[in-house]
């Protein structure tokens, strides 16, 4: 089966592009907008509309395979590719990628995914968002051409067992970190709430007191609202490097503070994502490793998650091999081709690192549903509920796609 025609269209993603460095520097609020000037190249304002490029591949049999090129909310930060704007990339796709897609055989996924992941135009690799969207569409094309589910294609090509069992799901609240928690508890989410602790003064506190109060409130709220004592969710909070800011990047002081949060969780497992941002990958690995070792020395049960500077497949390998943390976030759009997500999860699982198949609120329903199929095949420890910051909508998309797929897999046993 071959691709007859490739189409690229501009679209909106499910959230916004935010200049992370400007926010860390103290950008103010005006309603939903951030005030002040952007500092990351490519941004025209601190917050601007999220965009995507939809890929449609029309096959010889008339079936249409789809994928969405999307980039993370904090584009251009932490070693990532620059801001992804549709108007800049659609002409490029039509000129350079369309001729390579049309007439291409889609009977196998991996050769096509690897081709575009390694392709260089004018000496440069394709933007991660482009590789992400193309690979989604190519996986869908192979599934449609062969009458298989996308997760079956992944299992077959990696020689993995098809396991018709759910992956734990992680809900993200955005700034709605109180009301959204109630919603998550009502729907029994496995891991919550992300909480978006990306500002010292407003959210963390200059001594960490605001986060401490929030973790206590969070555990109290779960214990008081849950309908059954069997509901014992994991707490996972992303602090965007702010803990390092208030403790002068001292790994011992950072670890002592992180360990002190354990009692506030009242027996619920606690993960702290991105405790520091060292500004580059080698220093980030060293800092996280030092914090992890100190947490172990303290006998703490709190675990830390790598985020910043852990973007590509090779980054994930390096953070894992260093034993730098307890869990890595595999930020799906940052890896480019989705075959890298599979490889990253499998590497973590093989080497004793907990894998969190994450991503961004700034994706689309197409990319989120594709990620469900990838997760069901590769089996990470948890998967992010996405897209958007509304929570309910993302849960609807991800949870329902997972259950539909599991039901179909069960018919094939």
UniProtKB/Swiss-Prot annotation:
The record marks 194 as: Transition state stabilizer. Pathway: Amino-acid degradation; L-glutamate degradation via mesaconate pathway; acetate and pyruvate from L-glutamate: step 2/4. Its EC number is 4.3.1.2. Its cofactor is Mg(2+). It is an enzyme of class 4 (lyase). One of its GO terms (molecular function) is metal ion binding. GO terms for biological process: glutamate catabolic process via L-citramalate. Homodimer. Mg(2+) binds at residues 238, 273, 307. Gene3D superfamilies: Enolase-like C-terminal domain, Enolase-like, N-terminal domain. CDD domains: MAL (cd03314). This is Methylaspartate ammonia-lyase. It comes from Citrobacter amalonaticus. The lineage of its organism: Bacteria, Pseudomonadati, Pseudomonadota, Gammaproteobacteria, Enterobacterales. It catalyses: (2S,3S)-3-methyl-L-aspartate = mesaconate + NH4(+). PANTHER family: O-SUCCINYLBENZOATE SYNTHASE, O-SUCCINYLBENZOATE SYNTHASE-RELATED. The keyword Metal-binding applies.
